[in-house]
Each structure stands twice: as C-alpha cells, then as structure tokens.
Amino acid sequence: MTEPRLTQLEARRIALAAQGLDRRRPDRAPGARPPGVGDIRKALARTGLLQLDYVTVVGHAHEHVLFSRIGPYDTARLDDIAYRRREFTEQWAREASLVPVAWWPLLGPRRAEFRVRPWGFEATFNQLADYVERVVDEIRERGPLAAEDLDAPEGIERRMPGTWMRSVPRAVLETLFARGRLAVAHRRADRSRAFDLPERIVPDVHHERVLSREDAHRELLRHCARGVGVGTAADIADYVRMPIGDARPRIAELAESGSLEVVHVDGWREPAYLDPSARRPKRVDGCALLSPFDPAIWYRPRLARLFDFDYRFEIFVPEEKRKWGCYALPFLLGERLVARVDLKTERKDGCLRVRAAFLEDGAPRDEVAAELAAELRLLAGWLGLESVAVERRGNLATALRRATRG
C-alpha cells in the first residue's frame, strides 16, 4: 500500500499545530485577566514536558517556552501547578525536565537503568552506603531537604570542585533522585532543589504502577509523537532522548497497531510517523520568539528539514567563533522562521538589549521588523524591563531599531 504523502509545508503546519504555535496569542487589553493556570495547562498539554534550564540571559528558558504560547503570565503559577498541585514532577526525561506526574511509571526503566549505567560518582556513592541511608532516613523524619541542609560524610571533603554537583551531599541527593528513591518536592528561592520521598510526592496511582520496559517505552513514545505531530523515528525518540535502537521497535509497533500512521514527507530520506489525532491546518498564523529549548526547535536536524533553517545555540561557543550571537532566538512569523535576534537582559538599566538582528532570505523586512518589535516590547514587559535597545549588528538591525522607536 502506498504511504500517504505530505509536502514539507504540510508537515511544518502539523508540527506547529502540535505545539500550539499555529495561532497568534489572544490580544490582551490593558487591565484584562492575564493568562492563568488553565492557559498554562493547555500549553503544557501541547508540549508534554518542559526541559528545565535556569540560564538567565533572557529569563529562564523553560518559562519562555510558555510565554511563546500564552504571553505574559505569572511564572509563580507554573510553580504552583508543578510543586504544590503536584500535576507535574521533575525527572530526567529530556535532560532535567518537568513532566506530567502520570509519566512517573513511564520513566521507571530510565531510573532502573541508572543503576546499571550510573555516573562516575558511583564508586564513592557505594562507599557511602551508611551515609546514604542516613540521608534517606533524615528526609523521612524531617521532610524535604536540600544539599545545604545536610552535613558531609565524616572524613570526606564536602566540596566537589570541577563538577556540577559541587558537593558530596548534593551528589548523593542527585543520585538518589535519578534512581527514583527521592523526588523533587519544590525549588527554593535560589532555585536549588529540595527532595522528599517519592511516595509523598507522586500519587499512589502513578507511584505504584509498574510497567515492563517495552510497555513504558511504547507509552512514552506515544506521548512524544503527539508533541511532534509528524516526524521520523529519530525525531520522536529525541523528544525524551531515548536511544534510537530502543525506540524503533516500539514505534514500529505503534504504527502496526494504528496508533501512528506511516507517511512520506517530500524531501525526507526516512519514513515519517503521523499522530492520527494531529490537527492538519490549511493555514498557520504564528508569531513568537522561540527559546533555544523550545520543543518546536530543540532537535536541530528536524528543524532543518521542516524549516530550511540552520540553527546553532552558541552560548558555549567562543565569542570570536560565534556567527549569530551568544543567545540568538529564532522568530516565527506566520509559518516561517523569518529572523533571529541575539538578546540579553540588562537589569541594571531596565533594558532588553538586541545585540544583533538577522533577517532570513526572502522575508519581508519592514513587516518582520514591525512584528518583531512588538514581540520584543511584550517580552521586555514580561521580564520587568522598561525598554528595548537595538545595536547595529545584523542585516535587520536598522529596520528593527526604527520599528522599536515607532
């Protein structure tokens, strides 16, 4: 049987609709109700998960993902959904992520496999067995604790210089978390994690549900496919960084059962898989600056296939080797990525600074500048900044500077 065919543009529209980026955010008049918990839930239902990142070049990256979909919202409401209402929980999914609490059993194999393939801290961790159990007992008795609340093991240097874990107590907590013996109760004001027993965080219906490795992977990939809309096996697997060798058989089973539809996308070398419930809009009218960690663009090979857009996040690239800038964000207008801007918040001056602005080939300069200027003003206001300043670098800088002053 011949596979259904999609054009690149049709696939792009499906992908944007799957992420809730196919429509402009509602205009909110001054004094109108800001986006609330319901709006956040709807956006998260589209993305499925948020990859957590607390880099503060332009606010927190994962919070920006929601801003792109619902506009200026109170980030405390996201914390409320995750850490007080317990609708989401932190897990290692796509790196450190916020996932629906119902995904707890789906990530069970990943937690179990951490015991087989642990970090380099494993040898030290095994030597600290008594200390590890005391930590768990202390949390059981005292409630949620962070690394700063714990003493170091006797005779062991507390600090772990040169590692992101920074201290032995933190490394122990993080290892217990990755193995599923602890869960994140909340984030403190400094964004450090406080840990508790998972049975006090995850509802019994999810905590006690145990799935085989195959069933867990299959169900997890089904959720990933909804977020992707249409994509190759690699696109779907990357949504939660699942090894492709584990993902392919389960995706094939989903296709065999009718949970996914095999399609051919023009210009793609591999077959694609379509979520049968995906919306297939005839027209897309998006308008959003996208975080580097946005699910719509985080897998760069797929981004290139869908949008003909070459994107590299250059925050870790030496300055002299950067092409676009330290924190360049793609700008979605309509159904194209039409520009990219290198941004930086300057709290002291109350300014959102555009260090560079680049227009993509064939994009209408004046229209893009006007729409982007409005988006930058909205973003600046959400970040608590008073102004937008555009520097001279980039082929869109002059038009954008003029538009921001208009």
Where do the language-model regions lie?
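Long, low-complexity intrinsically disordered regions
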Residues: 1-297, 302, 309-328, 333-406
